[in-house]
Amino acid sequence: MTPDTKPLIGVTGPVNGGLAAWLMTALAIRRAGGRACRLTAERPGDADQLDGIVIGGGTDVDPFHYGEEPLQADADRGRTSILDWTVGLLVSAMRAVFARHDRETQNFDPERDKLEQTLIRHALYAGKPLLGICRGAQLINVTLGGTLYQSIEHFYQEGTSNPRSILPRKTVALAPGSRLRTLLGSEHARVNALHEQSIRDLGDGLVVSAREENGVIQGIERQGSQLVLGVQWHPEYLPQYRPQQRLFQQLVHAAKAR
């Protein structure tokens, strides 16, 4: 790849909906110097043409993949700067505009699971940089033999809540020596949260790179030279935070360096 070539980054999502996440992720990749192409179960593309992969957020990973039966989950809220509110309002409006397509009639998406697990294995085998966002981080973990908590409400005791918000209302601690901490440049990070599940047992070769104070895993990475990162939050919805955009910059840089 020449210095002027823009690496091609595949971004996964559902067949119906997910347009706000796709547009924000594509924008982040473009700002980082790459090109983005959307991948779905109906349009899987050619993995060999990709220089890097983002496994996006969305519906829950089917617990069949880690040997469990489905449970049911719940939700909640939480508080924030003028810039945060402005960006959050714009992103929320985008998501609302596309929401009529985002209502999935099923809790799981087996065809998407199949495509994304194939792409994860391809990236790991081919040494391509891989970033998992929310569901994507969970699926990377499951693909490598890990498990999930289908509900994380028990982590939030009386007087606390699990704020589900595009705004950065959670604080996570970044593990010393982790790639994630180096990228974000601090010991802690403020992040958003749209998830009701989280990683439980780690998959092969993965380590925890971020946690909430209550122990909920918020970031994972694979040891070694290959870039394999997973974050439980949505950095694509935080374009106003430069440290969060470094995740996409590092992905594009690693794709270019292959």
What do the PLM-derived regions correspond to, one by one?
Residues A137:
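The feature captures the ABC ATPase H-loop/switch
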